């Protein structure tokens, strides 16, 4: 894993995958900067999204989904942001995103790669919390680290 610079020029859109309790705040920030926002989630994760927040339920990320994105957005001007997404992004979709697909990971990498990182930390009595954003590559949780911030959970 590398920690290098990450830059998208002329960003116009932010597309979220997954779920977050703070989607409303993300939308407010994006609106402030005149960025189009769209949220895609799975059926089960949609239950965690406030009903006032517009979102689309999708079953899978496939060619039809890519066609939808191409019709409505330009991938080179779009930030694709995964927040606890249920999907494992395949090589073709990662390439389609033009290097603009990132993932929020709430734990350290590479120590806590993959799913279940919160549970593993509890079982290991690990008090280190980490907010981390990394680029998405075909290998899970192995992309370039773009941002991270460590904190200790109180005892």
Task: List the predicted regions and their residue ranges.
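One-carbon transfer enzymes
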Residues: 1-155
